[in-house]
From Swiss-Prot:
Subunit structure: Homotetramer.
Binding-site list for CTP: S14, D147, I148, E149, K187, T188, K189, P190, T191, Q192, K223
Superkingdom in the source lineage: Bacteria
Source organism (scientific name): Acidobacterium capsulatum (strain ATCC 51196 / DSM 11244 / BCRC 80197 / JCM 7670 / NBRC 15755 / NCIMB 13165 / 161)
Name of this chain's protein: CTP synthase
Positions of ATP binding: S15, L16, G17, K18, G19, L20, D72, K239, D240, V241
Record keywords: ATP-binding, Glutamine amidotransferase, Ligase, Magnesium, Metal-binding, Nucleotide-binding, Pyrimidine biosynthesis
Organism placement in taxonomy: Bacteria, Pseudomonadati, Acidobacteriota, Terriglobia, Terriglobales
């Protein structure tokens, strides 16, 4: 069978949900028994997002092979069975880097290197490489049609249609149909202009996903179809929903998968969406509520913690609970009234981050959770700060710190990875990707996983200093997870506590709605057991509120 491609583009404005659309289409095709690949092209000049500010880019999603990628790859993995690699996310910067390397090596034999054909060929070759193992490859093009940065990618997919034919390629365009309250009507002009822009570069969309807050009536669909040169069935209502996990069901109801398969000349079984439907049912009919306070450095932009939030949702759904998240600015907890800000939460979580800003506030939050027996979950920096707090306030090691925050600290509880000593480059130099971990029998971690050998994804430059292991474990801290060779400490716990666990890795990157991560499930369960009284909850299944912005 020839390789089949679905290209997902966006128009009018950014942040319309191209990534969720691609993931949802992948979910539906998998439910029909097809093997699905997904990839994203990002038009920025950074080689990868690893050194980009979370406030600009959002979360950096890490794959098993250690690639630092766009957060949309997290959606791809959560909605499908795909396990992605660095080949599934390419940027303009990385493509240009590859081309310049080839040019310096003499691969182009003296030719003038140009956007067409050299850049577009590199893009097409990347798509073919990913498509080699699968039935359908879904390719998301980052940015918005009309952006100068996206033009080489759009030209590449235009050429793919020419080379492979209509029966092997489908163009899905995500656009906006806004409701204008003053006029009390839906406006189609933004969509018409977006499609006109696509046509100007030689691409006729086959399917339009129209983002809107209500179902599109027949007359609106008919109007869009007429002016955008496609059949009315191909004008899809991409309606706003309270839970992102409802999107595949909305698309199935609108017939997106059937339409794409008809265009691709593919026959499949009927989709089995029973588990997905049951998941959405739990989203909207929780039996209780759990409140989690997340103490972070980048809480002003929730996309900085996209996978983290979703992993908590997965844990809550596994228990049939509504999740209420409160985002707490870590610096705000450096004030004397920090205990007042932290009271009332069923659980406290400190996620990853870099730099010393807000660390003292995190330490206050950890102390509060430890002393008041509030379930605590620390991830990456959250584990490191838990060790520092324990060293200071339980072991009495005054001035204990990380060399990242205080190079002159008398007690380096956390220090730079030994193999990174003398390394000055920032990009791609951390301990990245999947690493094995061995758990102690009888520990919280082993009980949660149900086994003692695991593999988790990492992204860090600093590690626990094992010179302090005897002091901390002698005072009651338990090291329950290490690398197989015992080089790195991966998990710490406090046994004399309802739930207190810190891990050096990022478990959120492997959590899925139908397969919640064991540590998030265990944490949410412990937090709910700490919740008094157990009140009935109402939809939606997850809410967010900020503190200290």
């Amino acid at each position: 069978m020839s390789a089949k491609y679905i290209f997902v583009t966006g128009g009018v404005v950014s942040s319309l949900g191209k990534g969720l659309a691609a993931a949802s289409i992948g979910c539906l095709l998998e439910a029909r028994g097809l093997r699905v690949n997904l990839m994203k092209f990002d038009p920025y000049l950074n080689v990868d997002p690893g050194t980009m500010s979370p406030f600009q880019h959002g979360e950096v999603f890490v794959t098993d092979d250690g690639a630092e990628t766009d957060l949309d790859l997290g959606h791809y993995e959560r909605f499908t069975h795909a396990r992605l690699t660095r080949d599934n996310n390419l940027t303009t910067g990385r493509i240009y880097e590859q081309i310049i390397t080839k040019e310096r090596r003499g691969d182009y034999l003296g030719k003038t290197v140009q956007v067409i054909p050299h850049v577009t060929n590199e893009i097409k070759n990347a798509m073919r490489k990913v498509a080699a193992d699968g039935d359908v490859t879904i390719v998301e093009i980052g940015g918005t049609v009309g952006d100068i940065e996206s033009l080489p990618f759009l030209e590449a997919i235009r050429q793919m249609r020419q080379e492979l034919g209509r029966e092997n390629t489908v163009f899905v365009h995500v656009t906006l149909v806004p409701w204008i309250s003053a006029a009390q009507e839906l406006k189609t002009k933004p969509t018409q202009h977006s499609v006109k822009e696509m046509l100007s570069i030689g691409i006729q969309p086959d399917i339009l996903l129209c983002r809107t807050d209500r179902y599109l009536p027949h007359d609106i669909k008919s109007k869009i179809a007429l002016f955008c040169n496609l059949e009315e069935k191909a004008v899809i209502t991409a309606k706003d929903v309270d839970s992102i996990y409802e999107v595949p069901l909305v698309f199935a109801q609108e017939g997106v998968d059937k339409l794409a398969l008809r265009y691709l000349h593919l026959d499949t079984r009927e989709p089995d969406l029973s588990r997905w439907s049951a998941l959405v049912e739990r989203c909207y009919h929780p039996t209780g509520e759990v409140s989690i306070g997340i103490v972070g450095k980048y809480v002003e932009y929730e996309d900085s913690y996209k996978s983290l939030k979703e992993a908590l949702v997965h844990g809550a759904l596994a228990e049939g609970l509504k999740l209420r998240v409160t985002w707490i600015e870590a610096e705000g907890l450096e004030a004397p009234n920090y205990e007042q800000q932290l009271s009332g939460f069923d659980g406290i979580l400190v996620p990853g981050g870099f730099g010393k800003r807000g660390v003292e506030g995190m330490l206050n939050a950890i102390r509060y959770a430890r002393e008041n027996k509030v379930p605590y979950f620390g991830i990456c920096l959250g584990m490191q700060t838990a060790c520092i707090e324990f060293a200071r306030n339980v072991c009495g090691l005054q001035g204990a710190n990380s060399s990242e925050f205080d190079p002159a600290t008398p007690h380096r509880i956390i220090y730079k990875l030994r193999e990174l000593t003398g390394v000055e480059e920032m990009g791609g130099t951390m301990r990245l990707g999947a690493w094995a971990c061995v758990l102690q029998n009888g520990s919280l971690a082993a009980d949660a996983y149900g086994k003692t050998e695991i593999s988790e994804r990492h992204r860090h430059r600093y590690e626990f200093n094992r010179e302090y292991e005897a002091v901390l474990t002698g005072a009651g801290l338990r090291i329950s997870g290490t690398t197989p060779d015992s080089t790195y400490v991966e998990i710490v716990e406090i046994p004399d506590h309802p739930y207190f666990l810190g891990c050096q890795f990022h478990p959120e990157f492997k959590s899925k709605p139908l397969e919640p991560h064991p540590l998030f499930h265990a944490f949410v369960k412990a937090a709910y057991q700490n919740h008094k009284p157990h009140t009935e909850a109402t939809q939606p299944a997850a809410e967010s509120a900020p503190i200290g912005k």
